[in-house]
Amino acid sequence: MDVRCINWFESHGENRFLYLKSRCRNGETVFIRFPHYFYYVVTDEIYQSLAPPPFNARPMGKMRTIDIDETISYNLDIKDRKCSVADMWLIEEPKKRNIQNATMDEFLNISWFYISNGISPDGCYSLDDQYLTKINNGCYHCGDPRNCFAKEIPRFDIPRSYLFLDIECHFDKKFPSVFINPISHTSYCYIDLSGKRLLFTLINEEMLTEQEIQEAVDRGCLRIQSLMEMDYERELVLCSEIVLLQIAKQLLELTFDYIVTFNGHNFDLRYITNRLELLTGEKIIFRSPDKKEAVHLCIYERNQSSHKGVGGMANTTFHVNNNNGTIFFDLYSFIQKSEKLDSYKLDSISKNAFSCMGKVLNRGVREMTFIGDDTTDAKGKAAVFAKVLTTGNYVTVDDIICKVIHKDIWENGFKVVLSCPTLTNDTYKLSFGKDDVDLAQMYKDYNLNIALDMARYCIHDACLCQYLWEYYGVETKTDAGASTYVLPQSMVFEYKASTVIKGPLLKLLLETKTILVRSETKQKFPYEGGKVFAPKQKMFSNNVLIFDYNSLYPNVCIFGNLSPETLVGVVVSSNRLEEEINNQLLLQKYPPPRYITVHCEPRLPNLISEIAIFDRSIEGTIPRLLRTFLAERARYKKMLKQATSSTEKAIYDSMQYTYKIIANSVYGLMGFRNSALYSYASAKSCTSIGRRMILYLESVLNGAELSNGMLRFANPLSNPFYMDDRDINPIVKTSLPIDYRFRFRSVYGDTDSVFTEIDSQDVDKSIEIAKELERLINSRVLFNNFKIEFEAVYKNLIMQSKKKYTTMKYSASSNSKSVPERINKGTSETRRDVSKFHKNMIKIYKTRLSEMLSEGRMNSNQVCIDILRSLETDLRSEFDSRSSPLELFMLSRMHHLNYKSADNPNMYLVTEYNKNNPETIELGERYYFAYICPANVPWTKKLVNIKTYETIIDRSFKLGSDQRIFYEVYFKRLTSEIVNLLDNKVLCISFFERMFGSRPTFYEA
């Protein structure tokens, strides 16, 4: 029997079992049950002394045990690391057992199962039937997995089954209550093993009149009275809420491969199961494949107060306890962990994922027609957009949300007519968000037409789950994660990096016959992070070349062989004499390149020097682990370059990014005290070497010159750690034209990247030169495994401060005719605590600054005068006209209790609001507020006690005739940011004092 593993899961009853859900070549699903064991590693001496004897034991052969406690010394008399070799045994017990002096107890039992039996969690195997005992149709017991799964075979494709769902609930306040608010709609996207896709929505008929129900039937809806009458081929079905819930129960109890929701673990599934129990007393029940254990659907929470989220709220995750092999997958939780976005609402995520450049085909009266295909955007983007458009009801054109009037869709493109104001450009960016509807108002005016409209919105949200599933390549990532982390598919995204790293670490330790032990308590000290340079100026009219180190920290660990067992010791000094003696003797006793000595900042205030010494002769555990991850990343990057469609590119890009993150997380885990990889000296040495590498690159580029086909680097090309046999001559021949004459200046750097200004505004030449620079740096400047990559040309760069800048980005693969991407790194445009007015204005002024830099007709003083003069005109005009709507000035904040002071004004504001309003603001909820003052208050220069002007803005709020927006608060914040973009501090201070009666705060460089 040939099978492919698709999921592993446990039953937690009186008799614990491990189950495999697998699929045969013919699409048949087969479950295999295994005994569940707890695993212990002991020496032969302990094994022989155990009473009673172990349930099962396997010899592991001779293994080397290394004590990885850090040795701290004030001189070079460092004792050798304790190391011993002994015969070891792996013990399997069906129940937990207290065994003294067992080692390797930090690893997961499931990882031991896979590795000890030679099984890959996502592998394909030809099973030996003699080791299988049939339990029932489709379920077998296996007591000897090692022999049963001995024959691994090449991977083969199998079909998968899915259920994507969404619900809508009636509510009369801000959030539905399971006790009083019925479910109005449930929508499903059902894909079976044959690939057949069914879309259907159940509508609660109890919220409609009998006349409306009859009209719905006349319009083609199916009306059913019981579960037995359900026809899944029909798109719209009317039924009572009880029948609606019974159908949900039936579907959720089926053994799909995946049941996918968006925030369903926290809301949809919880609401369905609670509502079902409330109305019928029934529960959703899952049964194990052997039919011997039944569990009720239950959502349980994990609260990790050690991982605080925004506003001090504990990081809470939600999990479904099922035992039937289905993976309940919450896209909301997954995207939060894997993507860094401004917002994790479904509309924001969809807008980020599904966009396409569309060409204007026709302009009508308040409507426009767009066409999209492979000629209007990158290959595949229009096809993905068209797929989402099949259920989409609204399309966003730039920032304008437009209703779909008509749509034509074909294989690789679309034509769509939108209700839209007349726009003048020929092409626009079209994107998808969640349908732009006011559900509260729709329920208030609820009737048949609204119910049918909501059905369309609900099924679109269910389908969005499918589209996002495919966009993020979740299935590919799940299988790759299971293989890489040595974890079940259902657990790949459950754990943090400190846990997922344990599987590959255990595998490596067993391959190298190594056991790492500690006898001392782990100590935690602070240490310096990556190097961030201060920006050398604010605005750049010349182009800036961006060079990034490839996986800097992982490659630092590989270069220095940084690992707890390769650390020879740490030499510290408390006075200058000690330091001088140690420095003189150090290189004699520990000569490079076998050893590397890393100067770090002292761990304690009474020390003046600290040097870590690593042995590079035998590759350590951490470098070996990193090589595996980097090799996988390189494989997916190669596949990314060869991919032809945007979908393939998105999946391979996300896969290489996954391996990048896990490789980079190893550095973080070295400094995390609860990690199996914890090594304070290694983590500290990693950042120290990283800082020296970025300083080295900056030193050779800052002041470099190109002329007559020769590049003269600014300094000799000397290895900053030890002398080697490389040519250090800074003059290098290039393949560039001999008439090129350019100078280079390093203007900024951040951890693993260097920003280098070239005295040119020509994008094509800048890219050409940067690519040659990349080649020369990698071949002549850098050494060992260090490499850099030319990332982009930044045009019209505006540096606000460290880690804050705005620019137009031309990627390495583009040219001067390409459309540049606007980048806002760490600026107000990307923050949620900034008003739309502020964002709009700062965007206008940054664009204006960018244009001034491009034209190059003004010096920095003239630019400053022009910008400040224009800003004053705009602010005075807005203050006098008061024409902008209140929504442009609204801010949002999360309500929480994590305040140092009990009488915090934010807490007082919400408490007073809740006293006087039926729709109270709950903990963890975001609320909107604005600064409001009396209408007769003149322009206020000196702003005091501005917290007292905060007013919560809800749906019922209307700005009274005796009130106005307290514009000065917003103007001052906007002006503070703009003056930080300008170079002339004297003019900025004078302007700010005249407008607001105080000096501005300038960002620290």
Curated annotation (Swiss-Prot):
EC number(s) given by UniProt: 2.7.7.7, 3.1.11.-
GO biological process: DNA recombination; DNA replication; viral DNA genome replication
Keywords: DNA recombination, DNA replication, DNA-binding, DNA-directed DNA polymerase, Early protein, Hydrolase, Multifunctional enzyme, Nucleotidyltransferase, Transferase, Viral DNA replication
Alphabetized Pfam families for the sequence: DNA_pol_B, DNA_pol_B_3, DNA_pol_B_exo1, DNAP_B_exo_N
InterPro entries: DNA-dir_DNA_pol_B, DNA-dir_DNA_pol_B_CS, DNA-dir_DNA_pol_B_exonuc, DNA-dir_DNA_pol_B_multi_dom, DNA-dir_DNA_pol_B_vir_insert, DNA/RNA_pol_sf, DNA_pol_palm_dom_sf, DNA_pol_type-B
SUPFAM superfamilies: DNA/RNA polymerases, Ribonuclease H-like
Reactions performed catalytically: DNA(n) + a 2'-deoxyribonucleoside 5'-triphosphate = DNA(n+1) + diphosphate
Induction: Expressed in the early phase of the viral replicative cycle.
MF annotations from Gene Ontology: DNA binding; DNA-directed DNA polymerase activity; hydrolase activity; nucleotide binding
Subunit organization: Interacts with OPG148. Component of the Uracil-DNA glycosylase(UDG)-OPG148-polymerase complex; OPG148 and OPG116/UDG form a heterodimeric processivity factor that associates with OPG071 to form the processive polymerase holoenzyme.
Main function: Catalyzes DNA synthesis. Acquires processivity by associating with a heterodimeric processivity factor comprised of the viral OPG148 and OPG116 proteins, thereby forming the DNA polymerase holoenzyme. Displays 3'- to 5' exonuclease activity. Might participate in viral DNA recombination. Does not perform OPG116/D4synthesis across an abasic site.
Family: Belongs to the DNA polymerase type-B family.
Protein name listed in UniProt: DNA polymerase
Species this protein is from: Variola virus
Source species taxonomy: Viruses, Varidnaviria, Bamfordvirae, Nucleocytoviricota, Pokkesviricetes
